[in-house]
């Protein structure tokens, strides 16, 4: 019994033990307060009572918040850190404070912030991050803050906002976001629409204005004129050649990704083959098929050649190049993707007999199937598989090399769902 009493006393003493020497601690209005403001501190002092619910470290010289900075005070409900020199907040610095309702980081030098820590602060009602150097907010930064009522982001360096950033803030009643250098391109149009329709109080709307482009500088977002904006769209087609490229002799598979959207989307190719996945930021070659500076290639011509016009060439197509070919277009308004599965077979593996039984040629201008002059595009879910059948033909009399040598012809059939594409290539 005596041991139990001693243990209880030890716990009580821990809860009410003195504050760190520079700070004052006490109870006020039912809250356990630790006041360390204006103490010229350069770090969070250790030794706080575990029952502290309000901690003020405002007006000090804190340069940053390390991981576990507030591990001693897990019951904190209010944390005041304004007017310091905080440049960064490490991941894990704030995450343990699951009871936090008010967080003030205003008037610092914040350029890096542990946005993921906010996911654990679901009780937060007030978040002040104004007067910092923040240039970017992740789309999911506030995804767990359904109780947040007031958010202050004014006087930062924000130039863009990801669409849907404020959608999780269902309790939000006050948003201050003025005096940021917004880039008034298509990516900001959603915020104008949201702000005009929202019941959230947004003060100083005349100071929520464009900084770029120059022609729109100073115009408030609420009076932003209509912009020619559209989300990306893609159409993947299959062609036996592309404009202006110098092709090597041999069989070449050519795909073309027709991209539309405003602003002009960025095009990427995602290629999944038996040997692994290849990611290509288009273009990676010039019009001569040679690798551009900075493109990864072990020789003058990469295995997969992505051209600026949206074409993708695969020289010497073979079994190792079988797989799924996807083109992905992305701009500020979203992304779009189209894919095709490509498989290579020989006539001995089904050949023309399989063609006749499984697929039917589509007549085009009296022809029984598509020719090299026709571009084929998938018309439905069944048209997303390309099977290439190769055969060798004798040298045609009309195909003669510059030095008089006859050319060898390689013929092929591309099966595109319900369509056929007959290809002929000449090897000199």
From Swiss-Prot:
LRRCT domain ranges (all copies): 180-231
Cystine connections: 257-327
Key words of the record? Disulfide bond, Glycoprotein, Immunoglobulin domain, Leucine-rich repeat, Repeat, Secreted, Signal
Q: Which ranges carry the Ig-like domain?
A: 232-343
Which SUPFAM superfamilies does UniProt cross-reference here?
Answer: Immunoglobulin, L domain-like
Sequence ranges of the LRR repeats? 51-72, 75-98, 99-122, 123-144, 147-168
Q: Which PANTHER family match?
A: IG(IMMUNOGLOBULIN) AND LRR(LEUCINE RICH REPEAT) DOMAINS, IMMUNOGLOBULIN SUPERFAMILY CONTAINING LEUCINE-RICH REPEAT PROTEIN
Q: What is this protein called?
A: Immunoglobulin superfamily containing leucine-rich repeat protein
Organism, by scientific name, is Mus musculus
């Amino acid at each position: 019994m005596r041991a139990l009493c001693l243990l209880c006393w030890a716990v009580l003493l821990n809860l009410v033990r003195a504050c760190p020497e520079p700070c004052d601690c006490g109870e006020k209005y039912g809250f356990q307060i630790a006041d360390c403001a204006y103490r010229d501190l350069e770090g969070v002092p250790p030794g706080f009572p575990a029952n502290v619910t309000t901690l003020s470290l405002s007006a000090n010289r804190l340069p940053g918040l390390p991981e576990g900075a507030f591990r001693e005070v897990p019951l904190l409900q209010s944390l005041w850190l304004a007017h310091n020199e905080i440049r960064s907040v490490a991941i894990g610095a704030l995450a343990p404070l699951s009871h936090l309702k008010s967080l003030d980081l205003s008037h610092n030098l914040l350029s890096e912030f542990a946005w993921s820590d906010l996911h654990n602060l679901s009780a937060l009602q007030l978040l002040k991050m104004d007067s910092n150097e923040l240039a970017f907010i992740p789309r999911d930064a506030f995804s767990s803050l359904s109780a947040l009522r007031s958010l202050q982001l004014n006087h930062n360096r924000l130039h863009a906002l990801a669409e849907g950033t404020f959608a999780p803030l269902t309790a939000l009643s006050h948003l201050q976001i003025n005096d940021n250098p917004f880039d008034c391109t298509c990516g900001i149009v959603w915020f104008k629409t949201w702000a005009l329709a929202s019941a959230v109080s947004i003060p100083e709307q005349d100071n929520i204005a464009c900084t770029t482009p120059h022609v729109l500088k100073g115009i408030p977002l609420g009076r932003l004129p209509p912009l020619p904006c559209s989300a990306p769209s893609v159409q993947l087609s299959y062609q036996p050649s592309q404009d202006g490229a110098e092709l090597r002799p041999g069989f070449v598979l050519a795909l073309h990704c027709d991209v539309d959207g405003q602003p002009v989307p960025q095009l990427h190719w995602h290629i999944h083959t038996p040997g692994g996945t290849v990611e290509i930021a288009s273009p990676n070659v010039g019009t001569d098929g040679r690798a551009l500076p900075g493109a990864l290639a072990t020789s003058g011509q990469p295995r997969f050649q992505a051209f600026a016009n949206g074409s993708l060439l695969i020289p010497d197509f073979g079994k190792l190049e079988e797989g799924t070919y996807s083109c992905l277009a992305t701009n500020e308004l979203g992304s779009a993707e189209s894919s095709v599965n490509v498989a290579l077979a020989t006539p001995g593996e089904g050949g023309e007999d399989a063609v006749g039984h499984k697929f039917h040629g589509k007549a085009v201008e009296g022809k029984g199937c598509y020719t090299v002059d026709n571009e084929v595009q998938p018309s439905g879910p069944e048209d997303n598989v390309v099977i290439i059948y190769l055969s060798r033909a004798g040298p045609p009399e009309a195909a003669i090399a510059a030095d008089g040598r006859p050319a060898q012809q390689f013929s092929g059939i591309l099966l595109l769902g319900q369509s056929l594409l007959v290809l002929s290539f000449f090897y000199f």
